[in-house]
């Protein structure tokens, strides 16, 4: 059983981002090593298209010049090669997709993975990607909110009929009720954004991670105000795990756990070799596991 931190939340679940790894064999081998070590989850970006490096000089983070593997395809592949590892989109740009298609894809992935899917969603600022896919950027936040409701209706397994601002469904369904699919929203810390998370999401993925307790405390209060259990709200963040600085791993993990973080993505510095990055992640996970106050819930 997982213990609780000072905020009443579950102990840390550790994870690793696979974004940037494109070779199928390397994806498989990395996922298997993480799975065997008891790491809780892996994540992949949900962007569809790449841009030229340096296209957005006013944006210090990310350039969108990477090759993006489709997370539903990759996770289906990895599900066949792992046993416990959970799969998280971080983040799927939900307004780029038809909600009915995502309902189908996520339900199938939840089934074939044995209930190991977590759907992290967000809206992005990359207007060119929206335009290329025939979608509007205006109103994408409220559209995403409606999409989440539509997804949950489809996941109920029955034929549904609904008419919303952006969606109309007349007596259609996906034909089954998949295992539960947690929905986490990636966004900033403004109160309207946290209020949306509190009302409709199962977790929050703060953009760029988080280092202070204040926003998490606000989120938990908003969650309680919405009539939901604040202790069940998951909160993600990131922890730098430089191979040459293992002493900082536990201190950083303890600090994140203390402010209420529940899900910690272990992140080697840019430029670290693949082998060194994996070794650092596995070593950091082992160190966190060995610390009783912050040991991960490996059953998650």
Task: Please place each PLM-identified region on the residue numbering.
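Active-site-adjacent structural elements that line small-molecule/cofactor binding pockets in enzymes
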Residues: 1-300
């Amino acid at each position: 059983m997982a213990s609780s931190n000072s905020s009443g939340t579950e102990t840390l679940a550790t994870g690793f981002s696979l974004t940037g790894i494109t070779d199928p064999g390397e994806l498989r081998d990395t996922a298997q090593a993480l799975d065997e070590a008891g790491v809780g989850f892996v994540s992949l970006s949900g962007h569809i298209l790449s841009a030229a490096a340096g296209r957005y000089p006013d944006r210090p983070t990310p350039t969108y010049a990477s090759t993006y593997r489709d997370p539903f395809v990759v996770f289906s592949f990895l599900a066949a090669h792992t046993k416990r590892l959970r799969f998280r989109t971080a983040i799927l740009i939900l307004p780029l997709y038809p909600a009915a298609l995502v309902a189908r894809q996520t339900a199938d992935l939840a089934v074939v993975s044995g209930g190991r899917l977590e759907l992290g969603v967000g809206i992005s600022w990359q207007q060119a990607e929206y335009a290329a896919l025939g979608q509007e950027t205006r109103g994408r936040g409220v559209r995403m909110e409606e999409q989440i409701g539509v997804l949950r209706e489809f996941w109920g397994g029955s034929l549904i009929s609904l008419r919303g601002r952006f969606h109309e469904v007349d007596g259609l369904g996906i034909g089954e009720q998949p295992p539960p699919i947690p929905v986490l929203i990636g966004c900033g810390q403004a109160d309207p954004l946290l209020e949306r998370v509190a009302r409709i999401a199962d977790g929050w993925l703060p953009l760029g991670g988080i280092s202070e307790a204040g926003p998490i405390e606000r989120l938990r209060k908003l969650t309680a105000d919405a009539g939901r259990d604040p202790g069940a709200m998951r909160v993600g963040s990131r922890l730098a795990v430089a191979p040459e600085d293992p002493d900082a791993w536990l201190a950083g993990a303890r600090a994140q756990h203390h402010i209420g973080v529940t899900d910690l993505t272990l992140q080697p510095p840019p430029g670290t070799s693949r082998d060194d990055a994996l070794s650092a992640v596995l070593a950091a996970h082992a160190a966190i596991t060995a610390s009783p106050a912050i040991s991960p819930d490996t059953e998650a």
